[in-house]
């Protein structure tokens, strides 16, 4: 083992939580280092939408309709309940604006409100239909220099400088059904041409967020070691004093005088942990999380006595298992002319539910919990040719043919009739026909009498305003008909190390493991089994990473 490296704070993981912890430490008088197992930095945060759900932040105060932070508190308590700890909820609400402002001061963080991107439960007291989510503006990442080459790749990469924001996607997915489609498409094209002319390196969504945070680390001269795997934590008299890592094939000890922050993501790519903790069917091939997320930080925490919670849950989303990468379905389920059935040919939910809730319904039981296999899996998204002609689907433009490899893989099935479609996917044809007929009646009436699809502002965000009287309901009548296989995909796992309001890791008896902190998907979620709104994963990751570093630096004066 090589000579010891000594830092005040050692941060494991280079996603949003890890970078926020290191930045906070550096600007509060501590020396810090970030270690990253992968050969690229950014983690799942770089593959995400990059949005933040942080009520009361300065961007919302400036751009969004007046909001009461107490309403956000009421809302979050209302949807989460007591299972994730009421003190942590209050801490998140109270400290969020402070964290946002800190990042604005010490990084080129530049965000904007996403109008109308609703909270995921807007009808709950305190929920907001106009939304509380902010997203990164397009960011020229040339300032990163050579570091840009090792940024974790985007989930859905495109041509250089052809980048889309969440606000762009909202205007494009309806195609020519949306009168704003052409103006927005022209604006995107002009942005692309200008960026190419100026030789920019534009990034949006999670790519932009992580490039902004990485800029802050570079400005603060915080070292980041790539290809450095966490092996173990070292304790001295009950306190974590550092970590053993493997770098360039050699194990070495990195001493942490103030503490270690585990921000290494979840365990979505660990088949063993998913098999142990999560309900079937499950696998590592349906996630869009970073490949390095194999639960290393969680296991190391457990090895020193840490408790874990919510290990059976994830940041789920119904997904299509396409041959190369899974497609995480956002708008597809909300658009008129589609419905979801189980293998019995029955609808079992409002298809337009927020993605975590929708996948919980696919598994069945309260919050998707249970001991047996999922009750409504496999599931199928059924749609017709009119739907395909009108709307984008899984990255395809309206009317674009379904790729042959999708059909050959079984991810998507096509047939001239509903009866033939049912036979091909193993669903009772008569039941499927009856289900579609009943649904078509709801579509013509404009009211889903079974599941209330289209009644929530969240449902309508991805709906078609030109579809009357309900933007989420349309009859399936024009063949050929299609079935896209729906699997329980995810953005990452939810469960992790139990922490308190200072992000200190706790044992099962509630006692603190001194010197050990956790944030992000390595920690148990403040959101519990729910998901408050767009950006409700990264928002808490930033806040509790900041609080971990602040706690570690508590006896030292801040530098700004």
Regions found by a protein language model. Name each.
Residues 1-9, 27, 207, 211, ...:
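Extreme N-terminal leader/targeting segments of oxidoreductases
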Residues 9-34:
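N-terminal Rossmann-like FAD-binding beta1-loop-alpha1 element of flavoenzymes
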Residues 13, 246, 256-257, 262-264, ...:
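Short, well-ordered coil/turn residues at beta-beta hairpins
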Residues 37-223, 340, 347, 386-389, ...:
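Conserved N-terminal/central alpha/beta ligand/cofactor-binding core
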Residues 125, 130, 135-183, 298-300, ...:
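An anion/pyrophosphate-binding glycine-rich loop and adjacent beta-alpha core
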Residues 200-207, 219, 247-327, 538, ...:
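Glycine-rich loop(s) and the adjacent beta-strand/alpha-helix scaffold that form part
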Residues 232, 236-239, 431-526, 530:
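A glycine-rich dinucleotide-binding beta-alpha-beta segment and adjacent secondary-structure elements
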Residues 300-307, 433, 540-559:
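Internal hydrophobic alpha-helix adjacent to the cofactor/substrate pocket in enzyme cavities
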């Amino acid at each position: 083992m090589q000579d010891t490296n000594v830092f005040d704070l050692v941060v494991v993981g280079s996603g949003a939580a890890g970078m926020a912890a290191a930045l906070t430490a550096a600007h509060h008088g501590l020396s810090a280092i970030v270690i990253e197992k992968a050969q690229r930095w950014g983690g799942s945060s770089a593959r995400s939408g990059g949005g933040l759900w942080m009520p009361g932040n300065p961007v919302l105060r400036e751009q969004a309709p007046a909001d009461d932070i107490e309403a956000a508190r009421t809302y979050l308590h209302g949807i989460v309940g007591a299972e994730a700890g009421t003190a942590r909820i209050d801490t998140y609400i109270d400290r969020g604006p402070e964290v946002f402002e800190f990042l604005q001061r010490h990084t080129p963080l530049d965000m904007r409100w996403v109008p109308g991107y609703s909270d995921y439960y807007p009808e709950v007291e305190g929920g907001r239909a106009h939304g509380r989510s902010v997203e990164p503006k397009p960011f020229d990442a040339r300032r990163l220099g050579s570091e840009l080459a090792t940024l974790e790749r985007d989930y859905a990469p495109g041509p250089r400088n052809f980048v889309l924001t969440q606000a762009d996607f909202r205007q494009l997915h309806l195609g020519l059904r949306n009168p704003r489609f052409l103006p927005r498409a022209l604006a995107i094209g002009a942005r692309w041409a200008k960026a190419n002319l100026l030789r920019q390196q534009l990034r949006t969504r999670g790519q932009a967020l992580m490039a902004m945070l990485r800029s802050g680390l570079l400005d603060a001269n915080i070292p980041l070691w790539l290809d450095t795997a966490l092996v173990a934590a070292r304790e001295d008299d009950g306190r974590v004093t550092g970590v053993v890592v493997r770098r360039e094939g050699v194990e070495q000890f990195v001493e942490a005088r103030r503490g270690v922050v585990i921000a290494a993501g979840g365990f979505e790519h660990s088949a063993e942990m998913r098999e142990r903790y999560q309900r079937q069917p499950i696998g590592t091939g349906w996630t869009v999380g970073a490949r390095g997320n194999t639960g290393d930080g969680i296991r190391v925490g457990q090895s020193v006595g840490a408790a874990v919670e919510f290990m059976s849950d994830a940041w789920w989303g119904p997904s299509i298992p396409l041959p190369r990468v899974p497609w995480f379905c956002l708008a597809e389920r909300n658009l008129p002319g589609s419905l979801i059935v189980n293998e019995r040919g029955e609808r079992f939910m409002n298809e337009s539910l927020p993605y975590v809730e929708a996948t919980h319904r696919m598994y069945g039981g309260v919050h998707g919990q249970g001991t047996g296999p999922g009750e409504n899996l496999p599931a199928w998204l059924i749609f017709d040719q009119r739907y395909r002609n009108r709307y984008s689907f899984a990255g395809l433009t309206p009317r674009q043919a379904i790729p042959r490899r999708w059909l050959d893989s079984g991810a998507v099935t096509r047939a001239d009739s509903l009866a033939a479609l049912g036979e091909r996917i193993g669903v009772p044809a008569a039941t499927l026909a009856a289900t579609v007929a009943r649904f078509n009646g709801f579509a013509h009436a404009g009211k889903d009498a079974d599941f209330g699809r289209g009644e929530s502002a969240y449902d309508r965000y991805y709906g078609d305003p030109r579809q009357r009287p309900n933007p989420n309901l349309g009859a399936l009548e024009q063949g050929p008909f299609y079935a896209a296989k729906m699997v329980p995909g995810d953005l990452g796992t939810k469960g992790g190390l139990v922490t308190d309001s200072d992000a200190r890791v706790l044992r099962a008896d509630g006692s603190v493991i001194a010197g050990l902190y956790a944030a992000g998907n390595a920690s148990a979620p403040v959101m519990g089994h729910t998901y408050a709104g767009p950006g409700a994963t990264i928002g808490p990751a930033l806040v509790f990473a900041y609080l971990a570093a602040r706690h570690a630096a508590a006896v030292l004066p801040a530098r700004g």
